[in-house]
């Protein structure tokens, strides 16, 4: 199930990992954009923070961006299949919890309005 939005820390521009990314390479700003696109991809597709290799071009990324994101600790390698966004489970709703919340809301609406879910 997809999320209509993700949580994004307002202090992201000052995050030491983002600063290391931006200050550490001439293409660091582009890699930071890939990081944000990856978060929206994971939220939209309900991947719980997993970015499959085949999705990299869809989030405006290249292998060099993935390498930089891993080097600063924003992503972690997930074998040959892709990457995991570091800290996703701590700050974002899981796909499972989103589904449970949606079902509860449907049942509550049905009870309130007398409709079957």
Task: Give residue spans per PLM region.
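Positively charged, structured surface patches that bind polyanionic biopolymers
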Residues: 1-95, 99, 103, 115
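Eukaryotic partner-binding/assembly regions in large regulatory complexes
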Residues: 104-109
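Charged, low-complexity alpha-helical linker segments
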Residues: 110-117
């Amino acid at each position: 199930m997809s999320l209509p939005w993700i949580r994004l820390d307002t202090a992201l521009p000052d995050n030491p990992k983002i600063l290391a990314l931006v200050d550490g390479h001439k293409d660091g700003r582009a890699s930071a954009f890939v990081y944000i696109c990856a978060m929206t991809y994971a939220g939209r597709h309900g991947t719980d923070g997993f970015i499959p290799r085949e999705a990299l071009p869809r989030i405006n990324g290249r292998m060099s961006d993935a390498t930089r994101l891993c080097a600063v600790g924003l992503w972690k390698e997930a074998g040959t299949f892709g990457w995991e966004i570091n800290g996703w489970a701590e700050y974002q709703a899981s796909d499972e919890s989103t589904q449970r919340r949606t079902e509860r809301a449907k049942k509550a609406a049905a009870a309130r309005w007398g409709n079957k879910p």
